[in-house]
Structures are given as structure tokens and as C-alpha cells.
Amino acid sequence: MNQAMATPLSLSCCSPTLTRSTLFFTKTFPFSRSFSTPLPLSTKTLISLSPPHRTFAVRAESQNGADPARQYDFDLFTIGAGSGGVRASRFASNFGASSAVCELPFSTISSDTTGGVGGTCVIRGCVPKKLLVYASKFSHEFEESNGFGWRYDSEPKHDWSSLIANKNAELQRLTGIYKNTLKNAGVKLIEGRGKIVDAHTVDVDGKLYSAKHILVSVGGRPFIPDIPGKEYAIDSDAALDLPSKPQKIAIVGGGYIALEFAGIFNGLKSEVHVFIRQKKVLRGFDEEIRDFVAENMALRGIEFHTEESPVAITKAADGSLSLKTNKGTEEGFSHIMFATGRSPNTKDLGLESVGVKVAKDGSIEVDEYSQTSVPSIWAIGDATNRVNLTPVALMEGVALAKTLFQNEPTKPDYRAIPSAVFSQPPIGGVGLTEEQAAEQYGDIDVFTANFRPMKATLSGLPDRVFMKLIVSAETNVVLGLHMCGEDAAEIAQGFAVGIKAGLTKADFDATVGIHPTAAEEFVTMRTPTRKVRKNQASQGKSDSKAKAVAGS
């Protein structure tokens, strides 16, 4: 592996992939038990085994290192007004605590001196990215409409500057809503960079604030490997706010950020090349989903360069960029974007100087209650590199507020967290992949459907949908649900309730479908595509035969 391309484990809070290898199990058991030992499966409970965290001596229900006789400026002082920080501060205030949060001045591109209330998700992550996804999908819909009788006198044109201006206006509106939410909850918002001075003191641009508890919720930042010419590259922050649309763009990375931006720029009619170090995209996702999404993105004109690592970037006299890899050089790019992971934004916060334990990747070590090695200091969200998704940070924030100010020690619940990739076609899923399920439980039944959606029968486009259920052969509990195709995220969100509740395949079979929809396929798949057994070869095919008739 090219050492320059070593990617941090941390992902965005918007990330759909559970960090490291969060696995789903069905019975509480000691961490000392071998991970390879199959576990008995309850029909009603799915719990997750998150990456092991340090267990500290001081528990959540104690005074947590606070001096009961001391007077503090605030009960809770939060560094970072992103999704998790705002949620924790607001709930703390609702529970009767005095609360303050500090945040850097607003900017669409983050830096050591800029940030903004709302954090990555609102300003340079989930929200603006989804708006650009919407914008890019219209070109495909224009193509689809021809088969339904629509005709256009001229080719529709896209105005990039209008999109970015409208997007930025929406971000300002949302940031204002976040500020008002804090104000209405009685949370004091302080603009500036926070740094921890001691276990109960935060310095914000030279002014000191004392707090009974300090919460670190600073999120993460994009990571670009240190290669010659890296100054010519852009990251995901910049890609959301470019002054002009790329004509030809290289996207380095095979994760969800890379695929989402590949779909965005492809839909906006840029020439898109994706360079990945491995043979496949989306490491950690279900293998069939990985294959299906790459194949369908390629059909839309995206060119994948597999097993290629960047070596250098050069700039020609005409301003065009060239990307040199271990296999050769591709020239003529207007932009080169790196989507090679994110790192916890914990540098220069004063953590180590006050005794907070920080991992090699910069993530803050916490226990099950989000408490650090310093009893009065806590951390949530991407800064801890647990499960880096916005809804998870929100959950962690509420759990923390309950633990500290509601006399209700609460651990975040990482069971059956659904996730999505807003690629084109999009991906949605919840629970175990087939590979994880086979490793943990041995005997599983796999149900798949690969079909042409109804809309494609008239559009004439090569769009397809892939859907998959993974079921325990022993108990009939549905362990995982995965989909790639239109509305996958929306469909997966609904089924996530059932997966977390521990529903069985029989429960799915007993549910009446809504016709005609793609979602009904999840409750009409009756025959396993294959049966995977621990002590014998798999029975069946690696993929289902394509169904030529939509709605079947």
C-alpha cells in the first residue's frame, strides 16, 4: 500500500458506514468471548458490538470529578455547535442545566479559524450534498421523460452559479434556525475557538469560562494524503462550493463520499473518473451491493480506475491538471478531488495537556457513557470515531444530557443503525451484510431480487434495482436488509424499525405489500436465492436471475 494514501478510520458524521466493524449480535456477552464463536439468536433483540472503548473508573451517576462546593459559570460547556453539540446543549438546558456552546465563525469551507453553527452536516455535509444530488438527478429524469411522451424544443441547460447561490442561501437559513433553537432553549452561544485549560475551564479566544462538565463535539475534517501537488487538489468541502462546474474531474477514493460526488458531477454532465486503491468500491458494504452499484454507475458513464493509488498531481501551463498513479498518468482534468476519509478535528484543543486520552488517529477515547479519562470531560460524535453518522451524534447528545442532568444514566444504543449512500443509484440498508452474518451465525438463508423497475419499461434506460434479505436459518430472524435502486434510503428507513425489533422472515411474509412498488419485493420474496451453511458449500446462486417484468 502506498503509505501516502493511508486513510484514517474516521468517517463523516454523515457517513453511512459504521466505523471500523460495528457488528450486530443478539445477546449480551463478555468482550472476552471469541468473536468467531456463533451466538444464540433471540427473535426479538438485536444489539451491536461497537469497537471496544476504554472503561474509566468514574461512572456516569457519580459527581464526575466536580467539586460540589465550587461555583461554575455553566453546568455544561460544549465545544462545537454541530448536530451533536447543539442537541446535547439544548437538552441539558431543557433539563434545567445552565448551558453554553462555542463555535467558530460561519464558512462553507472549514478551517482552523472557520466553522459555523450546524457543523458539517448542515454546512458542508448531509444537507448541501443532498441538495446537489437533487440537482444532478434532473438530467436522468429528462432522459426518462422521453419514453413517457415528453419532448423539449432544446436541450435543458444547467446554471451552476444559481445552484450554489440558492444552496448557500438555504445553509444560511438553516444556520439561523439552529441559532434560534439554542437561544429559545436558553443556551448561550459564544463565537470563537474553544480550548480546554483544565478539567473545568475553557478558553475561548482569551476569555475563560468555568463549567461543571465540558463536552467536546468538534466533528471531523477531510483528509488529503501528502503527495506532490496536493495543493492543486480539492476536498469535499470545496467541491460543494466551487465557483464553476468541473468539466472533467478525477475523484480519488472508493467510499461513500467519492461515489456520491461522482453521481453529482456525472448527473451535471461533467466527465467523471473515479480512482480507487482496491478492486471494488465501498469497503465494508455487502459484496453484492458493491458490485451492483459500481456496474450501474459505470452504465451511466462514470469511468472507474481500480487498484490505482495517486502518486502526484501536476499542473500544465493551460491550467489543466494531471493525476499520476502507480499505473500511469491521466491528463486534462479541470479538478482533482480527494475523498480519502476524514480525521477527528481534535488538534490543538488542549486535550492531552489536561489528561484526556486520545487515540493515534486523533479520536477521543470514551467509555459507554461518552465519558473521557478525565471525569468532568465528555465527547460525542465524529470526534470519538465510534459510529460517525449525524443521527448517531444526536442520539449520543441526548444520552449524555440524560446521564448528567436527568439522573438517568443512558448509554447510546447502537443496535441496527440504518445507513444510506446517496449515489446514483442510491443505497440503503440496515443490519448485517451477508459476509458478517455468515461469519457470526454460520447458517443463513439469502433472499435476493434483481429486476427492472416499472419506470424503466417505458424510459428504455438500463436502470435496475437490487434487493436483499439475510435471514438466520435457525431462528428465522431477519439479520440484514440491503437495497440499491431508486428510493433505497427511504425504503430502508421504514424497514429499519422491523429489523431493530427483531422481526422474522415469517413476519415479513405475513405483511401485505403495496402494489405497484419496489418496496413490496421485501415482503414477497419467498424462495432463498441460496442457503449458506457453515459446514458445507453454499447452495444456490451468487445472484438472482434478473426479472425482466417490472412489478413482479
From Swiss-Prot:
Its main location: plastid. This is Glutathione reductase, chloroplastic/mitochondrial. FAD binds at S83, G84, E103, T120, C121, K129, G194, D382, T390, H515. Catalyzes the reduction of glutathione disulfide (GSSG) to reduced glutathione (GSH). Maintains high levels of GSH in the chloroplast. InterPro entries: FAD/NAD-bd_sf, FAD/NAD-binding_dom, FAD/NAD-linked_Rdtase_dimer_sf, GSHR, GSHR/TRXR-like, Pyr_nuc-diS_OxRdtase, Pyr_nucl-diS_OxRdtase_dimer, Pyr_OxRdtase_I_AS. Residues 1-60 form a transit peptide. Glutathione binds at S83, Y178. NADP(+) binds at G254, I257, E260, R277, R283, G341, A420. Its cofactor is FAD. The gene is GR. Belongs to the class-I pyridine nucleotide-disulfide oxidoreductase family. One of its GO terms (molecular function) is glutathione-disulfide reductase (NADPH) activity. The keyword Chloroplast applies.
